[in-house]
Amino acid sequence: MGSPEGRFHFAIDRGGTFTDVFAQCPGGHVRVLKLLSEDPANYADAPTEGIRRILEQEAGMLLPRDQPLDSSHIASIRMGTTVATNALLERKGERVALLVTRGFRDLLHIGTQARGDLFDLAVPMPEVLYEEVLEVDERVVLHRGEAGTGTPVKGRTGDLLEVQQPVDLGALRGKLEGLLSRGIRSLAVVLMHSYTWAQHEQQVGVLARELGFTHVSLSSEAMPMVRIVPRGHTACADAYLTPAIQRYVQGFCRGFQGQLKDVQVLFMRSDGGLAPMDTFSGSSAVLSGPAGGVVGYSATTYQQEGGQPVIGFDMGGTSTDVSRYAGEFEHVFEASTAGVTLQAPQLDINTVAAGGGSRLFFRSGLFVVGPESAGAHPGPACYRKGGPVTVTDANLVLGRLLPASFPCIFGPGENQPLSPEASRKALEAVATEVNSFLTNGPCPASPLSLEEVAMGFVRVANEAMCRPIRALTQARGHDPSAHVLACFGGAGGQHACAIARALGMDTVHIHRHSGLLSALGLALADVVHEAQEPCSLLYAPETFVQLDQRLSRLEEQCVDALQAQGFPRSQISTESFLHLRYQGTDCALMVSAHQHPATARSPRAGDFGAAFVERYMREFGFVIPERPVVVDDVRVRGTGRSGLRLEDAPKAQTGPPRVDKMTQCYFEGGYQETPVYLLAELGYGHKLHGPCLIIDSNSTILVEPGCQAEVTKTGDICISVGAEVPGTVGPQLDPIQLSIFSHRFMSIAEQMGRILQRTAISTNIKERLDFSCALFGPDGGLVSNAPHIPVHLGAMQETVQFQIQHLGADLHPGDVLLSNHPSAGGSHLPDLTVITPVFWPGQTRPVFYVASRGHHADIGGITPGSMPPHSTMLQQEGAVFLSFKLVQGGVFQEEAVTEALRAPGKVPNCSGTRNLHDNLSDLRAQVAANQKGIQLVGELIGQYGLDVVQAYMGHIQANAELAVRDMLRAFGTSRQARGLPLEVSSEDHMDDGSPIRLRVQISLSQGSAVFDFSGTGPEVFGNLNAPRAVTLSALIYCLRCLVGRDIPLNQGCLAPVRVVIPRGSILDPSPEAAVVGGNVLTSQRVVDVILGAFGACAASQGCMNNVTLGNAHMGYYETVAGGAGAGPSWHGRSGVHSHMTNTRITDPEILESRYPVILRRFELRRGSGGRGRFRGGDGVTRELLFREEALLSVLTERRAFRPYGLHGGEPGARGLNLLIRKNGRTVNLGGKTSVTVYPGDVFCLHTPGGGGYGDPEDPAPPPGSPPQALAFPEHGSVYEYRRAQEAV
């Protein structure tokens, strides 16, 4: 967009700590400025102050701070801001009330019902954003053609709907007036199915605005997409944040004469486009700051590197942002920020907990970086404010940061330089711990120098930052080594060469304004307007005309909006998108057809079908041509081209680069003389050989030995990364190498999982992510597994070790094994484990093993889904594999495995597998995942040698062992100091009366324990029997919870423990016993008993509340949340899954659209948590009304025995399963049953509450600080993928 000549253009990135200002001045030259975002003693607003200083510098005259600035010389102001993100993190937004369909008052509190941290017994979860809830009397449901339901209406998706209850506006008016009287002025309105039937929300909005509410966010307008939970969170975030943003914008404008009425003021949105300040809203603002950086490197590095794909690496103080650009922005349409899931287009920026301010720890022999951060206050130790030791301090100790290049803004008076002495002193304390462990630990070794310790922490931090980059690239079929690393942010330049080397990249590109690249990106960005609407059409020739009409209508909206902002049509471009998925799957992809022109068999807007198939194949490795493709949403993105064009390239060099000074930098092997160059003095063509430092006012760039930097014609730094000279690593324990191997081993398991998810075909594995992949040592001991599904933690190693003992020498190259038998380490039969032994030249036995365990939706048995509620013997639960060679001599044994999967059909009343095609496809995917693991470990062996890799497999297990021994010693010492015995015990009962007894004897001298389950009841005639492997998984889960911090989860966790389980008991049943209920129910009781013995917390709901619904046309399975137990310093969380399960629940709108049910209520069961000084969490109430005849099955516990309280706390309420027949008859179904239900019947599930902790009469604890979000705001598709994996 053209702008008047001779005026200023400002681009400002207002970050959490610093505000960066990039100004194009009259005449075209550039000024940049960095200042503190908060400095109330000197100025009220950092962006205004930045503009004032630059205007003052250019005008050569003082401009008083207390007077509005003359804006007549300003053409435009563009801003990215963390105002929205900070308000979310600190929970300092507007007071909001939520208006929601009756029966769903707690829907957003329950959310997906999954907890964020699997192993934190306190279940910390960010609180909801709203202050009050009003339930709205209204209801819309999807039409299913039942008799007597009235005339259906058509929604905007094309779906037919029934308005069962219009909005009762009369009743609502009085409630809204009550909110106004209590000072609430902002509303979020979230009604069922409003994405397609928005009329009810619109009626509520009109009423609310008439009554005087200043902000009303309708979910149908904030983001009209199916799924009420994320849409509701989005509407709440909009209502919570937009008033704060508007106040900030208004306050900013008041700092200028005329309040910027004649200045173009634009704000960066989360999707990478600019928006006028009057349309800038909360739900589109949470990535406003980091989005500018992505735009910056996409417009600079990508173009200058000839279109080579780029990884953006933005390392700041608290965290690092990682992203990818290959010619178009990569967006996600649902992501969590500060615990709030938003449905809105956002750049896929992955935020990880490793930054310059990340704290450094030495724990149980392991170097640990983050996730805790020093923050801006007190900051790293070198800030002179008593802060902890951090990555920044390590770099300062190594000489990679020069205090003289930083302003004197540190210390209590903010007038001192950085303090290397403070960094050394803080790091010496950690080095003392390191060397004490090295000299007195299990494997005595020579102590490390302070510099070696600092170098170790830097290397561990680098490896931590490489993991998300590998996930972002390899997970989508991209080779990370084929990318350029675009490095920016204040701390990134010190780590760029090492990161690139670790990922195999050849080139690092650092923009000359890398310390302010987010501000530069704002200057280069375009104005964007998007329009989107939901859809439910098939992508087929008969719908192409409708799709073209919808796209044309949305395109017209975008063009009109941009023209209204002053853009001529010639500067406006549009891009159309369809949100497509295969029918029957949940994996939708937002695809553009800009590279696929229209054909005779496509819409006029382009061949979206070809684009979808191409991307699906690239990301998942196959397509499903026999399945129809469904259109979920139609979207158009309009762009008004308005980015500035910068032409301030430096002059060509006229001589060799001038060395400003020489300094000492520490690298592998010791200190090296290192020249220091000033970026401002370098010219085009200058070449600098590493090692060297390049300094400017905003960043420090380290060019490592073996690398070469060259100044490009645009003044940027392009570093050619040379191959690293490998150091000598021996098999003896090195804590630095141990930390690096820990990351490498975990990365192998993670990448195996990505291959499995990409190549599997079933919903369970591809979309629900119900699988684990793992690496094992030569003895079958677990080394690493991902994700950490609790019930898989101890079981897979039992499976591998059984095969080693069972087959002995009958294992050969090219063999792949299949097993699921409970006696062979299986958890339940649908979990099929594929194991590949790995041979190495010169070795006669396998040198390690890889395995993948995946839940197959059906493997036969008496009921579809292979999880029968009434099985009494193992054969009724499906196909059984004790030790089966799935691949023999490199040949997949399809005929034999097919016969085995069909074998259950020979058992009376049973069927063979009902989905052989998916079984075979997923088994092949598991074999492929194992092959990836073999390749990656082979690369590791090639780098370090077999003896070293196997040694570190042992070292990482010993590290986990040490952490558990430390915990057991601390627990025993605490009891001894209080005069209590070193033996603890606990007992609980299953609902059938079967006791589970545990006695734990602690040895202080050994740091070990005996867990003795003697006295536990015998196996039962039913399916509550838990295989031994399930009990071991429950034990590892509990030990990890009791340790209370991140440790490697592997075989070493069980090394300090001897487990006694009576043969033939419910915890180690006979080989013929049915076990499906043991995996999902008994495992929870085992956890309650172990945690009860240690007094860690009261009992949680102790049940997964398994509900199955099916008939000839459909099948549905869910597990339902309950109350978590309270602990010594926390109230139990309400409405959440606990311990051995973390499954997400189906969104209510998806549930009603796919299955013949109406969800009438889903809310907390208030008062069901046990009373106590700390109260137990409440269970939930869930009511399903049936619209078709079906078979309902429930498999539940805690219907007889209540979840216990501790230390005087009262037990939680029992669960209750009620069936209310259409005629009004109410029946208690008991804990386990199957019953036929008919249209009009209602199933009412009341789940148990958690136990209370402490005497209810004790004084209540003093109120804490206001609820805040989680300590570290991880973000992006890599984080969402891990969250989804851990919600199984």
Curated annotation (Swiss-Prot):
Statement: the UniProt record of this protein carries the keyword Cell wall biogenesis/degradation: no
InterPro entries the record matches: ACX-like_C, Hydant_A_N, Hydantoinase_A, Hydantoinase_B, Oxoprolinase-like
Principal location class: cytoplasm
Domain of life the protein comes from: Eukaryota
GO annotation terms (biological process): glutathione metabolic process
Molecular function per GO: 5-oxoprolinase (ATP-hydrolyzing) activity; ATP binding; identical protein binding
Keywords per UniProt: ATP-binding, Cytoplasm, Hydrolase, Nucleotide-binding, Phosphoprotein
CC per GO annotation: cytosol
Enzyme Commission code: 3.5.2.9
Location relative to the cell: Cytoplasm, Cytosol
Phosphoserine: modified positions: S1265
Residue list for modification Phosphothreonine: T151
Effect annotated for changing V1089I: In OPLAHD; likely benign
Start and end residues of each stretch annotated as Disordered: 1248-1272
Top EC category: hydrolase
Record bears the keyword Nucleotide-binding: yes
Pfam families in UniProt: Hydant_A_C, Hydant_A_N, Hydantoinase_A, Hydantoinase_B
The reaction(s) this protein catalyses: 5-oxo-L-proline + ATP + 2 H2O = L-glutamate + ADP + phosphate + H(+)
Family: Belongs to the oxoprolinase family.
General function of this protein: Catalyzes the cleavage of 5-oxo-L-proline to form L-glutamate coupled to the hydrolysis of ATP to ADP and inorganic phosphate.
Illness the protein is tied to: 5-oxoprolinase deficiency: A disorder characterized by calcium oxalate/carbonate urolithiasis, and excessive urinary 5-oxo-L-proline. Affected individuals have recurrent episodes of vomiting, diarrhea, and abdominal pain.
Subunit organization: Homodimer.
Name of protein: 5-oxoprolinase
Source species: Homo sapiens
